[in-house]
Amino acid sequence: MRPIRVLVAKPGLDGHDRGAKVVAAALRDAGMEVIYTGLHQTPEMIATAAIQEDVDVVGLSILSGAHMTLFPRVLELLRAEDRGDILITGGGIIPKEDMDALHAMGTGRLFGPGTPTSELVSYIKAWFAEQSQQRA
């Protein structure tokens, strides 16, 4: 089976990327191909990179409080390009009620501060296995 391809992105003006780098390293250590976009990415830049890199998953790290704008915009841009099949997941400081609202809009599971990276790895692997079975 081919490796899972994941784009890890830091949208918006938030300059704190330590968590995103830790997540990227954990995903890489778990055998996934990881593309890290770096800081200050717009939703348009993220969607374009996801399509160009043909990723399975986009992971957004958002600590700025703009999650209710950024997650839906990335989803909208990917769906407009007929790539709604890409899993949008991520984390940051996101209240539970906002996580629920974002999930209802179409995001995958979202993770809060202190979540072990192994939990994210397991979630992505399980999602990918399920998608692979559905395509077979």
What are these regions (language model features)?
Residues A20-S122, W127-E130:
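Cofactor-cradling patches in redox/metallo enzymes
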Residues M1-P3, R83:
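Short, flexible coil/linker segments at domain boundaries that flank nucleotide/cofactor-interacting
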